[in-house]
């Protein structure tokens, strides 16, 4: 009887481990890791299909915002240099730079930090 119980437990554990991860394979296409076919079926930050998996390859550029709102030419150049941030599956956003830019240029949000 104990052997049958152990076999049942082992089978349930195996099935649980083999279950698809809803974060990666669910209907929410904003999670990186979403399965894709390459026909624009990734969205949000995870907007590029690479080998049937959505990847994060967003380029966030705030030049338009800064050119309309910066007070002088030097501020525009400085802001543009600091606020062009590339995000991909390996890059991490520097929170010190983000905080500096938000405080200096009055932007509410630049980007969320990619998951580790």
From Swiss-Prot:
Extent of the signal sequence:
1-18
Q: Which GO terms describe its cellular component?
A: extracellular region
Q: Which cysteines are joined by disulfide bonds?
A: 32-46, 36-49, 42-54
User: Out of the domains of life, which is the source?
Assistant: Eukaryota
Q: Where in the cell is it found?
A: Secreted
Sorted keywords for this record are:
Disulfide bond, Knottin, Secreted, Signal
User: So what family is this one in?
Assistant: Belongs to the UPF0499 family.
Q: Domain comment text?
A: The presence of a 'disulfide through disulfide knot' structurally defines this protein as a knottin.
User: What is this protein identified as?
Assistant: UPF0499 protein ATEG_06693
